[in-house]
UniProtKB/Swiss-Prot annotation:
Keywords: Chaperone, Mitochondrion, Transit peptide. This is Protein ATP12, mitochondrial. Gene3D superfamilies: ATP12 ATPase, ATP12-like. GO terms for biological process: mitochondrial proton-transporting ATP synthase complex assembly. It is found in: Mitochondrion; Mitochondrion intermembrane space. One of its GO terms (molecular function) is protein domain specific binding. The keyword Transit peptide applies. It comes from Saccharomyces cerevisiae (strain ATCC 204508 / S288c) (Baker's yeast). InterPro entries: ATP12_ATP_synth-F1-assembly (IPR011419), ATP12_ATP_synth-F1-assembly_N (IPR042272), ATP12_ortho_dom_sf (IPR023335). Pfam families: ATP12. It comes from the Eukaryota. Residues 1-32 form a transit peptide. The gene is ATP12. Exists either as a homo- or heterooligomer.
Length: 325
């Protein structure tokens, strides 16, 4: 199943230190927010620019007839950067409560943009939904960084050298990192190949791995069959879920981690056993190399610890937004 992965072989740690991350051949760097700054007079834009608290009361307004819940400041519905109301379905009442809690917990002191991770992601989900409606103003699509097709093509590039497809050399960390990667990654890779077959007419879905002991320092690229299956999977997602996939992939540098998060927040009764996991294991999979670096060299204060908390926060935020009640 993994013809290029032989026992006892393991990607050079130094490869990933010298190169930020392997991407598909000739690809431009990813991982940045492509949303164009805009001056739409909304609460989220105002907070982003002033970093100051300007409200007294946070509340939820339930519209029973429409089955919607609006997040409000002083009786006015909070709007996204593109001017859409932060309104969710009644089925997402837990999400609405957590959004309210996020705003209620803010202090009166200077507010940092990362203080509202859940609101930021939900706003992205809502704006992506609205910009994918037929007849949407092209300028709004440009402000959010492109439509769903643009996002899908960007995310596909992460599959070429996915974090979970990059294997370290056997001589690093006395082979312990490679053994941990074999134990954690290989079952997930097999499960992912089986999962992608559901979105392809081809049965020979094989993910190309990047093994330092075999391939050395080079790029990596998935087959068209794999890419087409992955793109078909993304096409099956709602704009809301696509935004969550995007957030997870950008956080973990792993398309596979994005799929794991989304699929484990649905009904998992029919999910392939190898793909069943929890959020902490997704965080571990995405940061396995860093874990071993810290164990050997120690933690760099205000770097490793901050990065670890940041990744955990983003993964759990995405999980909350993806949760299906």
């Amino acid at each position: 199943m993994l013809p290029s992965l032989r026992k006892g072989c393991f990607i050079v740690n130094s490869i990933r230190l010298k190169l930020p991350r392997f991407y598909s051949l000739n690809a431009q760097p990813l991982g940045t927010d492509n949303t164009i700054e805009n001056n739409t007079p909304t609460e989220t834009n105002r907070l982003s620019k002033t970093s100051q608290k300007f409200w007294e009361k946070v509340s939820l307004n339930r519209d029973v007839e429409k089955g919607k819940i609006a997040l409000q400041l002083d009786g006015r519905t909070i709007k996204t950067p593109l001017g859409n109301g932060i309104i969710v379905d009644n089925a997402k009442s837990l999400l609405a409560y957590l959004l309210k809690l996020e705003w209620s917990s803010l202090s009166s002191l200077s507010i940092k943009t990362h203080s509202l991770p859940l609101t930021s992601l939900v706003a992205r989900c809502i704006d992506l939904q609205m910009t994918n409606e037929p007849g949407c103003d092209p300028q709004l699509v440009a402000k959010i960084g492109g439509n769903s097709d643009v996002i899908k093509n960007q995310l596909l590039r992460y599959l070429d050298t996915d974090t979970l497809l990059v294997f370290s050399p056997m001589n690093e960390f006395e082979g312990r990192l490679r053994n941990a990667q074999n134990e954690l990654y290989i079952p997930i890779i097999k499960g992912m190949e089986e999962f992608l077959r559901n979105f392809s007419s081809e049965s020979n879905i094989r993910l190309q791995i990047l093994d330092a002991d075999i391939h050395g320092l080079r790029g990596n690229q998935q087959s068209d069959i794999v890419k087409n299956a992955a793109k078909k999977y993304m096409s099956s997602l709602s704009p809301w879920d696509l935004a969550i996939l995007e957030k997870t992939v950008l956080t973990t540098k792993s398309f596979i981690c994005g799929v794991l998060l989304l699929e484990n927040k649905k009904d998992t009764a029919n999910l392939i056993p190898a793909l069943k996991t929890d959020m902490d294991n997704i965080v571990r999979a995405a940061t396995l190399e860093t874990i071993f670096q810290v164990e050997k060299w120690g933690e760099v204060e205000d770097t490793h610890d901050v990065d670890k908390r940041d990744i955990r926060r983003k993964i759990h935020t995405a999980a909350i937004a993806a949760f299906k009640q």
